[in-house]
């Protein structure tokens, strides 16, 4: 990204407005940042930025504020920066989370969201992997007792779901395993979103072959597949939006809360963004910053920050990048350690 004088002025306008909430004028830019440009030059550049839609005039002040387009430009600029600073206390807290060896990736992402919410004073959301579009690659059974067995479902993107099946006796468990073997041959390669329909179609065939035992398997599998295809999400810090000065308008506040509580809406919002990992709804004054969390080459979902358009993008983007990079590094090291043990 070639950085011109207008780019510098736009960046400063966005940062000053984020910090103060007050419209920004040419004189305040020059005085606050010791700019070596004349007032006329800065005013002229601001007029050009306004005419191209990057900043806009408010009704109550002669200063200017960033438009949605201006925020997008600023976010793209930050995303291209290689060494954004990250709050040291946040880094320490995140490393403490990583040191809890017994935790799952999902637990780590959830705890990361809690401290991100505190750092950014915004709502944070963990979105689980979108498994519905993935293909099933295996179903395996692990016996846990003489009357119980756990079915493990795995997709081509490495996402895993499980369901424990309980029966009355060993003979019935044997029948259950036969059912699973039958289904394994017919379900592998099926999209997760199509599994329930395929299971329903196979019900009569399986019942003819294996009798009543098939009902136990089918009901358990259908429950697991419905759960598999659902969007999983956990959110933190929703109450922080209640105290945000940008959300005095109750309708705008409700729009932000609705987005946090609806994983499908949030996914759609993220997909609709003109800048990768950033989306906005100008009318409702809602912005979403998100980052993919990849572990060993597979997506484990996204962490998203939801708030008004006026939020601390520099801090948020730096923290999201840090979490993604540290998670990936941590699990790469864990994988290498496991491989060395196997050798």
Feature names for model-found ranges:
Residues 1-11:
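Short alpha-helical segments that sit at the start of domains
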